[in-house]
Structures are given as C-alpha cells and as structure tokens.
Design a protein with these regions (language model features):
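Well-ordered beta-strand positions
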Residues: 114, 154, 158-160, 166, ...
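C-terminal long alpha-helix characteristic of the crotonase
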Residues: 117-122, 173-221, 246-252
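Hydrophobic, secondary-structure "cap" segments at the distal end of domains
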Residues: 140-150
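Conserved CoA-thioester-binding segment of acyl-CoA-metabolizing enzymes
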Residues: 1-49, 84
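Glycine- (often His-adjacent) and acidic-residue-rich active-site loop
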Residues: 50-84, 130
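Glycine-rich beta-to-alpha active-site loop
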Residues: 84-131
Length: 252
C-alpha cells in the first residue's frame, strides 16, 4: 500500500495502492500512520511519490458508490486528517509527482511544501465540482493558498486538468523535472530544506500555514454542511452519472 525507504535522513513514501493509488479509508489511515512515524528524529525530510503513471487519482469513487454514506461518514474525517498531517508535518515534505495527480491527489500534492512534477503526459487538476461533490474546507483552503484566484475559479468551475507547463504557471507545481530524474531532484530539494535548522523550519512552516488553518476554523459551519452533502443520495447519483460518462468516453 505504501512502500517506505530511508536514505541519509530522507524518508521516501511511495504510494502503491492499486493501479492509480486511489484514496480510500485504508490508504488514508496508512499514510497518517507514516507521517506520525516520520516524527522519528532520524527522519529529516519526507518525499511523497506514486507508482507508474499516477501520483494519485484522488478519492476512490467506485468505493464510495459501493459502500455508501456510512463509509463516507468514516472516510471524510480521515481524508481531512491525512491532509492536515501532510500540511502540518514540521519537517520538509516534497511531492515528487510522477504522473497524474487528480482531485484528492492534486490536493495531497498541494499540501506538500515543494512540488516537482515529471515531464510527460501527466495531468493535474481538481474536478470535484464536475463530479458533483463539494469541497470540504481544508482541501479548498490548501488549493486556494497555492493558486491565484483567477486560476482557481477556472480550475474549480471547469473541472479541467492541466499539463505541466500550465500547472507551473498556475502555481499547482513549483518545478518540472526530466523523466528518470524525479527522485534525484526531489532528494536534492529535500536535503537542501533539511539542512535548515529544524526548529526554525518548523516554526516558519507553522507561521506560513496557520492562516489556512484559521480560515478552516472560520468555515466550520459551512464545512458541516459540506460533509452532510457527501452523505446525501443526490451526491451518489452525481458520482454514478460522472463515472458512467467517464467510462463511456474511455470506450470510444
């Protein structure tokens, strides 16, 4: 599910959960546990990457449909906890985006301190609204902190995914990297960030991201309504319609 490797104080966490590392309850809990384990003083920085041509395809919509609202009731808080663990990890966290990073995969990458995407055909975006599900407060504020308002509205309302150059121009990623060099470059960045005083880095990171968390607290009432919407029958109708349309397109 998650492959772990340590090298010179850098912990590499590789998502290896099915073909596209779609997010479900088990992957979320496993990754949360990995971030807790990364509190070990021997770990100086974390690199998060994926397998094959996908970093992560986001929330496992087929699992949502299969297991229904009771599963969603358990999963949504875990998704929030995962993003919070990534964002607030006091150590440098580098996303080595090895391919497609869609929806929750895009947001997971955005929660990292530095984002490097491999050159190629990978796409990144947030199609949640097109799927028919609203954004919880934390994912929304993470993306809003990375992408300027005009680009943000374009991504959200269109639901489109973008390729590497447009993603960099928007702020979704920080840099691009040639094929075959992704982990080397991510390690270079992680080592550079890890060379900074750990205490100073942690305090600076806390100050940098505290406005995101404050805004989430302010949106608590709205977030409760969003969570409730994830449990409603019409949301599952929206997801089914989106999946049906997506499957039909892939068969053409």
């Amino acid at each position: 599910m998650i492959e772990r490797r340590d090298a010179d104080g850098i912990r590499i966490l590789k998502l290896a959960h099915g073909k596209v590392s779609a997010m479900d309850l088990e992957l979320g809990e496993a990754l949360i546990a990995e971030f807790k384990d990364a509190a070990d003083p021997s770990v100086k920085a974390v690199i998060l990457t994926g397998t094959g041509s996908s970093f992560s395809a986001g929330v496992d919509l087929f699992r949502l449909i299969k297991d229904g609202p009771e599963y969603a009731r358990r999963f949504v808080p875990v998704l929030d906890e995962l993003l919070l663990a990534t964002l607030t990890c006091p150590k440098p966290v580098v996303a080595a985006i090895n391919g497609h990073a869609i929806a929750g995969g895009c947001i997971l990458a955005a929660a990292c301190d530095h984002r490097i995407m491999i050159e190629g055909n990978g796409r990144i975006g947030i199609p949640e609204l097109v799927v028919g599900v609203p954004f919880p407060a934390l994912p929304w504020q993470i993306i809003a902190a990375r992408v300027a308002d005009g680009h943000l509205r374009d991504l959200v309302f269109s639901g489109r995914s973008v390729q590497i150059d447009e993603a960099k121009a928007m702020g979704l990623i920080d840099e691009k990297c040639p094929s075959g060099m992704l982990l080397n470059r991510a390690t270079e960045v992680a080592q550079k960030l890890a060379s900074i005083s750990a205490g100073a880095f942690a305090l600076t990171k806390e100050a940098l991201y505290s406005p995101i968390l404050e805004r989430v607290r302010q949106l608590a009432d709205l977030n409760a309504r969003v969570t409730d919407a994830w449990l409603q029958p019409h949301t599952y109708e929206n997801i089914r319609a989106y999946l049906d349309k997506t499957i039909k397109k892939s068969e053409i």
